[in-house]
Amino acid sequence: MTTERSSEISSPYAAQPAATSAAAPATTSESKPFDLDTVKKVRTVHLAQAKATGQKFSMLTCYDALTAQIFDRAGIDMLLVGDSAANVVLGYESTLTITLDEMIPLVAAVSRGASRAMVVADLPFGSYEQSPQQAVASAVRLMKEGGAHAVKIEADASMAEWVRALVRTGIPVVAHVGFTPQSEHALGGFRVQGRGDASERVREDAVALAEAGAFCVLMEMVTTQTAQLVDEAVGAVPTIGIGASNATTGQVLVWQDMMGVRTGRVPRFVKQFAQVGQVMEDAARAYREQVRSGEFPAAEHTF
């Protein structure tokens, strides 16, 4: 599979030019340039347009309605209800533990809270690997019961048929390549992917899944060179990076990481934009102290 061939991949979700009418007036007013910030409801076509016009888009993980509302107001374009909920919401040590039944209520909560952002739901470990039919059944539940707009699947070239089956069913797919956390044991732990000759394998995976119909390719923990190769190879299909440099169309982070809620060591690719965890701890401590001292509730808080 050559780069020349794969670079011609077009997104099936890209906007199609309007048909020309013979009765149309000779002169028409020029349409306004596409601006993702003006979109009232983000859809797959808008992400394809973003790549076509050189605009970047943002994605954050999200697991509840109130946080979805906050991120919506901030203009975040996509919300990922990730299997990372296993760690940051449910307290499991591994993302492998979370089940489809545990994911669906989280997806539904985010869907109820979001009005502009596209909601993407992870297919958790054990919910799709057996067959394309199992993947479709699980994805249908995430969309029907959870209200997701799309699903994300960790896959390689051998699972192109899974993507085709989902797309045939009418389910938009984000294909996750590079480091895939659900395969952490097979990959030898949390390790950067795509070094040296391995970059070609990541590229081949991405191209195969894009050709199968994925509307977006997410790359995790890959080298800058690999990210550049993949973004070019998949053509019009947008790319999302997490630890994949700024060569991608969009970026995603776990919100508890980028806002400093989780304590301890954070991955190298995380930038902490705030220390929300410390603010919460300080507020909780102040509340406890005022309750113990009798300062709260004061007269203005009583009837």
What would you call each of these model-derived segments?
Residues 2-53, 57-303:
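Alpha/beta enzyme core
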